[in-house]
Amino acid sequence: MLYCLILLLCLSSTYLPSLSLNQDATILRQAKLGLSDPAQSLSSWSDNNDVTPCKWLGVSCDATSNVVSVDLSSFMLVGPFPSILCHLPSLHSLSLYNNSINGSLSADDFDTCHNLISLDLSENLLVGSIPKSLPFNLPNLKFLEISGNNLSDTIPSSFGEFRKLESLNLAGNFLSGTIPASLGNVTTLKELKLAYNLFSPSQIPSQLGNLTELQVLWLAGCNLVGPIPPSLSRLTSLVNLDLTFNQLTGSIPSWITQLKTVEQIELFNNSFSGELPESMGNMTTLKRFDASMNKLTGKIPDNLNLLNLESLNLFENMLEGPLPESITRSKTLSELKLFNNRLTGVLPSQLGANSPLQYVDLSYNRFSGEIPANVCGEGKLEYLILIDNSFSGEISNNLGKCKSLTRVRLSNNKLSGQIPHGFWGLPRLSLLELSDNSFTGSIPKTIIGAKNLSNLRISKNRFSGSIPNEIGSLNGIIEISGAENDFSGEIPESLVKLKQLSRLDLSKNQLSGEIPRELRGWKNLNELNLANNHLSGEIPKEVGILPVLNYLDLSSNQFSGEIPLELQNLKLNVLNLSYNHLSGKIPPLYANKIYAHDFIGNPGLCVDLDGLCRKITRSKNIGYVWILLTIFLLAGLVFVVGIVMFIAKCRKLRALKSSTLAASKWRSFHKLHFSEHEIADCLDEKNVIGFGSSGKVYKVELRGGEVVAVKKLNKSVKGGDDEYSSDSLNRDVFAAEVETLGTIRHKSIVRLWCCCSSGDCKLLVYEYMPNGSLADVLHGDRKGGVVLGWPERLRIALDAAEGLSYLHHDCVPPIVHRDVKSSNILLDSDYGAKVADFGIAKVGQMSGSKTPEAMSGIAGSCGYIAPEYVYTLRVNEKSDIYSFGVVLLELVTGKQPTDSELGDKDMAKWVCTALDKCGLEPVIDPKLDLKFKEEISKVIHIGLLCTSPLPLNRPSMRKVVIMLQEVSGAVPCSSPNTSKRSKTGGKLSPYYTEDLNSV
């Protein structure tokens, strides 16, 4: 009997690993069954019982073949949290990072996860509350990552019960309430990341000072107010401190300089005041310091040479004094951004000589003297931005050898001398801006080396000589601005090869010869300004077929011959052909007194009202005398009748005029075919075509047959409790529209013809868009049953994206729309799209400007507002990009972002959930042809990128345009990295991916 027992024991010990192996494999297979695996990432998880799971992808085992780790990061898995994995008895680490794990988490999911040490569920689609029982279900947990989901409700106060937790990351969710003070009890914490949630305004809990082992504290965008609590001075192990995008006040505490291990301090975009701590030199481990966009005063401390700084950002403060010479001795400094301050003096001569500088932006200060010759001393400088200072002297030959440069902006200084030849041909240079200086010399042929050049801005200098043919080899060039120089010779024929060219301004030079004839390649040319030169010959008729040209100024030249009739094909905002030697008939479209100044100074021109121009023959002159006598007699009769009618009309309109036009100030931005009285006559209720928060919109049909849209802003409401119904809001809306639309020109931006401002009446007159808004077409019950096909929708998306890209990247300063939505995208007669309604637009404010900023109760519209707005109450271009992403998803689904079918989800969440559960086809608007499914899928991907919860993960509008062009086939695909999201590396704050002053 004893022998049998011993034999049985031996046999069972022999088979125990096998039993455990089979048990682990069974659990893993069951987990696989509960998940959708479109990428076949789990294909190695075999059904064969003889195959060890230790060799399966994502599975790791210990020495006894027990599964201890499951890492399914970025496997593109879809489904609920696979809680069955917790049944793996030896499981210590579980990662489902960057998948589409959805649904909510419950306490039951973690009942059997007692052995877990690390749990990573970040970058998924989880919703609902965080289970309060997690500290009790996971007593051994050291690492908890749930960032980048859609979790809501508060952080459970029970999280203070974790006894071994070292890292807690809940960033990028929709958590509310406040940061629980109980977290101060988790004294084992080394990393606490709660950034970018929807917390209520509150102070930093003083109890966090108990976390003396804390190395990373990331509380960016947490709606924090008040000063930094003194208790945080006990966090002597801190390496990274990030408090950006809050409303913290007071001075930067001096104890912060006593942190002996700190490498990064980010205080960007708060309301800190006072001076920088004098003892900053004590922080010998500090690598990155950013206190930009605060209210700091005083001087930059002089002991920065004691630091190992890699990045120093102090822009948009009120700092004064010189840049300390000691900063030149920093051997690690790569980023120096001090723009928009009051800094003065001469830059240290050795700046850059001992530092690997990459990004230097000292714009909008009061610096003087020469640009340091060794600023690119180590050959790594990429950005050199020194706009609007008082720098003088010449550009060093050393800069002409700096092949790493990509953006150079030196405009509005007092620089002079010749530009080094090598400087013109730097191979990586994309933007060269030298405007408003006193440079001399010519553009050398070496410019052919600047293969990446896209913007050449050299206006208002003393450049001379001819424009080299080699510029025509720079295929990516978008802008050539060389006005107000002394260029001579002919316009090179090679320029017509520049297919991406959008702006060509060579006005006020000494150019001669003819305009090149083969202009058909200028498909993107928006502005052509050759005024004030010595150009001659005929105006090429090819100018009239340039599809997006809206600014044409050829005035003050020596052009001759007739005006091409083809110019009537253009939709011009600006036309000026004055002071030339043109002759013949003015094209009928322009035979109007409002264009008189555009043709003045051309004695040979005539207006052919009756099919007759002047003939210099005696017999014809006699005939004209009789005709003129008859005309005068008839005119006299008409005049008398007209006077009577005019008096009657005046009496009728007197009341209207007295109230709306008595003190009116009309301001036009284009050549007008109508008068203000025509507009006032048509502001009748029967002509109302729309209502908005700021007023009514009228359709006005003018006597000449033209149609315009007129927005009449609401009158101020006296009394009441709504602060946003006041007259100040009307003024802000009016100012924002005028400031924005009155100064920009783009084919995808609606035109503002003119405006009127009087005591009680404000009118904005726009071009009329006959097909209404995108919202009307997608969601309205329109007569005629207009259904937008996919090609039309894709074109609308691209048009709108180009308009927003122009606002963000090509306007100086950049413009944030702040209310991007389908009802603010208007459609012309060909269903081309134009961005409209800039009533709450925000113009980026430059140093010293008095730019008004229009405000409203909410910057945006329901369903389109970016999530970060709720906790920062601030907007930037990333807010527009989020809203545009919603529009893209709206175009694909045909649903409104407030549609009841979406339930409590926003558009992006609904699309993600529907894709996970049902696949692509149910998401697509049933009105669309599924033969375009591949293109539609790509646009959905772009829309989801744009609506990423973290601003960091949203592409720029310029990138969005490129991606949409790739979808439409307008440009070849560039094979971008299509991974869903990437973990933030380096700096914690997600607002550093694009240069803030790199327009």
From Swiss-Prot:
Function: Receptor with a dual specificity kinase activity acting on both serine/threonine- and tyrosine-containing substrates that controls floral organ abscission. May interact with the 'INFLORESCENCE DEFICIENT IN ABSCISSION' (IDA) ligands family.
Disordered: annotated segments: 972-999
Protein name: Receptor-like protein kinase 5
Residue numbers binding ATP: 689-697, 711
LRR repeats mapped onto the chain: 90-112, 115-137, 140-161, 164-186, 188-208, 213-236, 237-259, 285-307, 308-330, 332-353, 356-378, 380-402, 404-427, 428-450, 452-474, 500-523, 524-546, 548-569, 571-593
Cell compartments where the protein resides: Cell membrane
GO cellular component: plasma membrane
Subunit and interaction comment: Interacts with CST. Binds to IDA.
Species the sequence originates in: Arabidopsis thaliana
In-chain residues carrying the UniProt-annotated modification Phosphothreonine: 872
Further remarks about this protein from its record: The name HAESA derives from a Latin word meaning 'to adhere to'.
Extracellular topology ranges: 15-621
Primary subcellular site in the record, as a coarse category: membrane
Entry-listed glycosylation sites: 98, 102, 150, 185, 210, 269, 282, 452, 576
Residues spanning the signal sequence: 1-14
One Gene Ontology MF term: protein serine/threonine kinase activity
Modified residues (Phosphotyrosine): 766, 806, 864, 871
Domain Protein kinase: residue ranges: 683-968
Residues the record marks as active site: 819
Tissue: Expressed in roots and rosettes. Expressed at the base of petioles and pedicels, and in the abscission zones of the floral organs.
Cofactor(s) the protein requires to work: Mg(2+); Mn(2+)
